[in-house]
Amino acid sequence: MEFYQLWIEGSTHYYHSLDNALRMGELILREMFSDDAEQGEVIDYWWDRWEAYEGDRKIMCITKEMMED
């Protein structure tokens, strides 16, 4: 069974759907980056790469994992 792990600066959340993990990440990024121009750039990168950065520091990412049934 596959699932998606959303890592946010030290905490981890698990989702069965990539879409749900990406949407939750987007909601969090919208709160973190209030400037519209910066927010749009970060969110576009998020949907393309499944990673988010603040400067050079990675603040969020999604990985695809497999679990034995």
What do the predicted segments below correspond to?
Residues 1, 16-23, 64-69:
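A short, sequence-level motif marking secondary-structure junctions
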Residues 7-8, 19, 42:
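Intrinsic structural disorder/low-complexity segments
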Residues 30-69:
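Short, mixed-charge low-complexity intrinsically disordered segments
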Residues 14-36:
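Short, flexible N-terminal segments of the mature chain
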Residues 1-12:
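Short aromatic-glycine-(Arg/Gly/Cys) micro-motifs in beta-strand/loop hairpins
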